[in-house]
Amino acid sequence: EEIPFQDAAWPLPFVPGLEYNSPAHGTWNIVHMGMLLPGSHQIYVCGANCNRGVILTASEMNAGDRFSFVEIKEEDLFNGQMEDLVIEGVSDILHKLPKKPSVVLLFTVCVHHFMGCDLNYIYDTLRSRFPEQCFVDCYMDPIMQKEGLTPDQKLRNALYKPLPMREKNLKQINIEFSNIIQRDKN
């Protein structure tokens, strides 16, 4: 249903439905955040059109050696082998890397959710094949959510997953990173 612009009113200016929300806001995006994690390697499983921005950002950061992708082609959407594509693609990448990363940030996309892809099976299989690597489930899904965490917030939480839980020690402090530039007020 179309709503003329002059009839759009807050808080629901448009009919609720599938909406797109860019995963990158401004000049800081999920690629930049993933690169903050030392020893990590990012793997994106998506179509070439989705990878464009990721590739450009990795190139801009001169971090092409910490980034790989598995390309989803049109036939992959219909052949019923999406889980195998992800598992074998990621496995191939890890076998070919000169040095295996300690952490793999594996980014799936909206198409995996639309298809009902069994992400638990994918991660369980990869973790059993590569027990020395920590796999972090990350998402590049620009499908607007009306509730819950945004993709950006999910990634920020996911970056802490590789850290083991420690006993509380009141004589220690924790210093966490931030991508917000602190400016001198003077």
Region locations from a protein language model:
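An N-terminal assembly and electron-transfer interface module characteristic of large anaerobic redox
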Residues: 1-186
